[in-house]
Every structure is written in structure tokens, then in C-alpha cells.
Amino acid sequence: MRLSRYFLPILKENPKEAEIVSHRLMLRSGMIRQQSAGIYSWLPIGLKVLNKVCTIIREEQNRAGANEILMPTIQSADLWRESGRYDAYGKEMLRIQDRQEREMLFGPTNEEMVTDIFRSYVRSYKDLPLNLYHIQWKFRDEVRPRFGVMRSREFLMKDAYSFDLDYEGAKMAYYRMFVSYLRTFARVGLQAIPMRADTGPIGGDLSHEFIILAETGESQVYCDRAYLDLAVPGADTDFRNDAQLTDIVTRWTTPYAATDEMHDEADWAKVKPESQVSARGIEVGHIFHFGTKYSEPMGAKVQGPDGKEHLVSMGSYGIGPSRLVAAAIEASHDDAGIIWPKAIAPFGAGIVNMKPGDEGCDGVSEKLYEALTNAGVDPLLDDKDERPGAKFATMDLIGLPTQVIVGPRGVAAGEVEVKDRKTGERQSLGIEAAINMLTAQA
């Protein structure tokens, strides 16, 4: 993409309404625009990041055996009355009527609807286990939306729901999602720690929040430093191997880790003082097992191997992709702007033409652009006629992992300068060497 043809509305000043780093940088770098309280449009560069996050989430959900569906945002109030949650939810749930005066709602979550889908089609234990997921925009009317997309009223969510014959099956479904989440966050470039957590209004008896440590985190968390050195499950993880999954979950739940709500001072005291980490954290995922909380009132049953009907045991697994984008910025930035992990960077590299109109600079920039594009690097070429300082500031702000600087002096020497955004290190390379290095990293 050429910057001269790209919609990138950069803000020079820090927005007054932005309280935290991610909100400020997302507005300044032209990722989002606020349309009303807690509701945002995603602009081209922000949407590219969001789509990359969703792609990783999809790949890992599919790898774990989940099936993608898409449920509607508008739900019937009757389903929620079946589960007993319609009156339990407060004003955060947007309630509406259609022209026939039927009561509807803008779904804040989808347990009822997915249970209705399941009970309509699945009759036998032979069709289990089953995990259905979707990625959908949701709305919760927060009393005080703040922190940009970190706590907004409209947000994107990946919800997965598992259905099993009994508790043992449901526990393994939970373990599959647990391991899938570890891999998902690692691929996004974040170090997430699973912590014991309250089940909240969804309910249940087994629950973990996945937390990344960040100074601006909204939650106080406590964990053993051992988590920082644990190896994330690799791509060769066999999600059909219950023993392997159990071993991974055991390793990732044995050291102490808990949110403030579940913190136990007696257990915390058993952790060596030098291993205690007390910090702020951001929730990026939450998984629950809630058994028959929804299958019982809604009659979701299957015939078991004994010929009898059994209520299915269920779990719910959520990741907020839009929130995850903000969390990645909170975890990786500096005074100049965002520092994107390579996996979710909007572009693979930025090419900075220091002197558009100069035959040499234009020629080298075009050569780099064509070679990197053909190699799948997806570069952003800054071909705008601006002063060098503004070009460098823009590139640092939007946080592309690598910058290739093309200037008259370097071109005359047959070289370009390659800058690593994270480390700030610069090196002069021959043009072909720079192309080879960047394509090898693609």
C-alpha cells in the first residue's frame, strides 16, 4: 500500500479524552474514531490489526476442534426467560421491541441462543463432544465506558460453547480451550497467565481468566514468577490426546496465580518472597465450565450409551479481539508510539522514501516495494512529500516492526538503512541484502 493513497488520519496532539496509553495511541495513529460514548469506528489500519487478531483466533479454535458459526446480534427475550436470565441482567442489556411489539434484546452474550441451536439438532451422545464458536459484535450499556476499546459499549467477541455428555467430557473440553488460549495469546505476541477467577453472572464451578501484566491494568493480580518462564504448547500439540492436555493444564495451574477477587493470602504466603509477583493486569480471555446451568432449564439433552436422556454439560470460552488489540498496545509501546508484535502488525515493513521526486530514491523505493509485495511482506510505502522528521514520527507512531529508509546519500552508495522499531537498532545494507533479510522474515 502507498501512503499517498491510504486513509491514515494521524493526530498530532494527544486527545484530551484518552486516559490510557492504548486509547491515546489508537486515536493518534488513526486506528479508531469515537462515534459516541463507548462506540468506535475502526479505520483501515486499525481494522487490519483487528482482522489479523481474528485470523489467529480462528486458526487456534479450528486447531482445537471447534466449529465456527455466526449467530444474530438481536435475540428473542423468550430464550432469556427460559434460562431465567432476562430479569437477572440489569440495564447493561439493551432491550428493544420490534414493530409487532415483540420483546427483543441486543445480545451481550449467547449461551441461550447456542443452547437453542444445540437442542434443535443434537440427540445422541455419538454427536459429542461438540464445540461451536463465533466472532460477533456485542453491546453492553456500560455505566461509564472508558479507556477506549478496552471498556467500550460495543465490542467484538469470540464466544465458544462446548457440549459434552458428562463432567469428565466437559473438563476435557475446558482443557482443550485452556491450551488453545495459551497458544492464541502467544501467537499474538502476548504473555498471558491463566488465573483462578470468579465466574461472575454467567455462573459455574471452574473458571480462569487469562491476564497479561501491564502497568495500566484495571485488575490487581498475584502470581508466581515461574509463569514467566513456562514454555507455551507448540504447534505439534495433539488436541485429541487427553493425557497431553491434562499435563499442560497441570503445569500451567500448579504455580500460584489469582485475580484480586480470588486471592488467598494463606496460599500466597507459601510462595517464596523472591518469586512473588504482585502487579496490575489486563484480562484478555475468560473461560468457564458451568455444567447444566443452561441445559437444564432449556432442556438440552442427549441419549446416552445407557439409553437414557442426559442433560449436556457445557462450558463457555471468550476472547475479546477488539480489547486484545488495545491490550497488545498497553504491553508494547514507547514514548514514540506503538511497537507491534510481528504477527499482528498492520504492515510487515515501512519503506520511507526520504526524497520523493528524486530519481534514485524513487527507483530504489519502487524496487523494494515490488520485491517485498511479491514476497508477501505487505509493505507500506511512504511516498508522501513531507519533511523527514514527520515521516519518521509517523512510522514510529504506527509501530511497524521494520523501517527501510531510502535517502539520496544511501542510494548513491547502493545502500538503504534498516531500522528495528523495537530495539531502535539501525544497519546499512545493500539493497538486495535488505530485500533478502526482510523476505526471509516474512
UniProtKB/Swiss-Prot annotation:
Signal peptide: none annotated. Keywords: Aminoacyl-tRNA synthetase, ATP-binding, Cytoplasm, Ligase, Nucleotide-binding, Protein biosynthesis. Coiled coil: none annotated. Pfam families: HGTP_anticodon, tRNA-synt_2b. CDD domains: ProRS_anticodon_short, ProRS_core_prok. It is an enzyme of class 6 (ligase). Gene3D superfamilies: Anticodon-binding domain, Bira Bifunctional Protein, Domain 2. Belongs to the class-II aminoacyl-tRNA synthetase family. ProS type 2 subfamily. Homodimer. NCBIfam families: PRK12325.1 (NF008979), proS_fam_II (TIGR00409). Catalyzes the attachment of proline to tRNA(Pro) in a two-step reaction: proline is first activated by ATP to form Pro-AMP and then transferred to the acceptor end of tRNA(Pro). This is Proline--tRNA ligase. It comes from Brucella suis (strain ATCC 23445 / NCTC 10510). The gene is proS.
